[in-house]
């Protein structure tokens, strides 16, 4: 009789434990039933890149002074700068400029150290081609500005879940005119400036005492 009761008790515990785990799993299922799918229906839907997204590099030829700083700071010496020295003006004249995006690691060093800001990062990331030699962009191809995801009439922009406001689980519900994820440089400076000012005033007070 005792063994029978022990078996019944063990069976009941197993049933309760199984019911608990099933309930936990169904709780997750019911929680996700209230959400919309997070799969992006590319190419009809595209994620909105953040403000500091490192995409295809844009080149402005009139600003380039052929200083080759971009080549020196590049980890793989990637940009190819072809120029001639004009003896009359004593300046370098650019003939051609090219970057092979099949080799580029998109580190952004060339953009950061360019003295004339002729290089900039765009939000273009669709660089798929059938021939890898087509990824070698010359100054004409680099000078083309891509269409922004938010301005493309045939694409539905979606914001990534990591950048959605608290409590919002659907990137489709974001307002069309909402800003991108991340802070702009001037916003970072404005946020840090009050802290620097307060620390400076505290230091001045201590020196005065």
Swiss-Prot record:
UniProt cofactor note: Binds 2 [4Fe-4S] clusters per subunit.
Alphabetized Pfam families for the sequence: Fer4_7
Subunit structure: NDH-1 is composed of at least 11 different subunits.
Binding-site residues for [4Fe-4S] cluster 2, renumbered to this chain: 74, 104, 107, 110
Molecular function GO labels: 4 iron, 4 sulfur cluster binding; iron ion binding; NADH dehydrogenase (ubiquinone) activity; quinone binding
PROSITE patterns noted in UniProt: 4FE4S_FER_1, 4FE4S_FER_2
Localization of this protein: Cell inner membrane
Coiled coil spans: none
Organism: Gloeobacter violaceus (strain ATCC 29082 / PCC 7421)
Entry's EC annotation: 7.1.1.-
Lineage: Bacteria, Bacillati, Cyanobacteriota, Cyanophyceae, Gloeobacterales
Main enzyme class: translocase
Top-rank lineage group of the source organism: Bacteria
Residues annotated to bind [4Fe-4S] cluster 1: 64, 67, 70, 114
UniProt family annotation: Belongs to the complex I 23 kDa subunit family.
GO cellular component terms, semicolon-separated: plasma membrane
Cofactor(s) demanded: [4Fe-4S] cluster
Entry function: NDH-1 shuttles electrons from an unknown electron donor, via FMN and iron-sulfur (Fe-S) centers, to quinones in the respiratory and/or the photosynthetic chain. The immediate electron acceptor for the enzyme in this species is believed to be plastoquinone. Couples the redox reaction to proton translocation, and thus conserves the redox energy in a proton gradient.
Bilayer topology annotation: Peripheral membrane protein
Keyword field: 4Fe-4S, Cell inner membrane, Cell membrane, Iron, Iron-sulfur, Membrane, Metal-binding, NAD, NADP, Plastoquinone, Quinone, Repeat, Translocase
The reaction(s) this protein catalyses: a plastoquinone + NADH + (n+1) H(+)(in) = a plastoquinol + NAD(+) + n H(+)(out); a plastoquinone + NADPH + (n+1) H(+)(in) = a plastoquinol + NADP(+) + n H(+)(out)
Protein name: NAD(P)H-quinone oxidoreductase subunit I
């Amino acid at each position: 009789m005792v063994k029978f009761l022990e078996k019944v008790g063990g069976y009941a515990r197993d049933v309760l434990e199984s019911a608990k785990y099933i309930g936990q799993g169904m709780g997750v299922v019911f929680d996700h039933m209230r959400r919309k799918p997070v799969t992006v229906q590319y190419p009809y839907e595209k994620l909105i890149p953040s403000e500091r997204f490192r995409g295809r590099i844009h080149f402005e030829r009139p600003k380039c002074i052929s200083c080759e700083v971009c080549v020196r700071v590049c980890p793989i010496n990637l940009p190819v700068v072809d120029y001639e020295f004009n003896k009359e003006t004593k300046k370098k004249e650019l003939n051609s400029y090219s970057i092979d995006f099949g080799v580029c690691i998109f580190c952004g060093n060339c953009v950061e150290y360019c003295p004339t800001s002729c290089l900039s990062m765009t939000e273009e990331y669709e660089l798929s081609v059938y021939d890898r030699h087509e990824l070698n962009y010359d100054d004409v191809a680099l000078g083309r500005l891509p269409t922004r995801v938010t301005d493309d009439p045939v694409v539905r922009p979606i914001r990534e879940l990591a950048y959605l406001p608290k409590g919002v689980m659907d990137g489709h519900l974001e307002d069309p005119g909402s800003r991108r994820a991340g802070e702009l440089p001037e916003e970072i400076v404005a946020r840090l400036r009050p802290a620097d000012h307060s620390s400076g005033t505290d230091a001045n007070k201590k020196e005065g005492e």
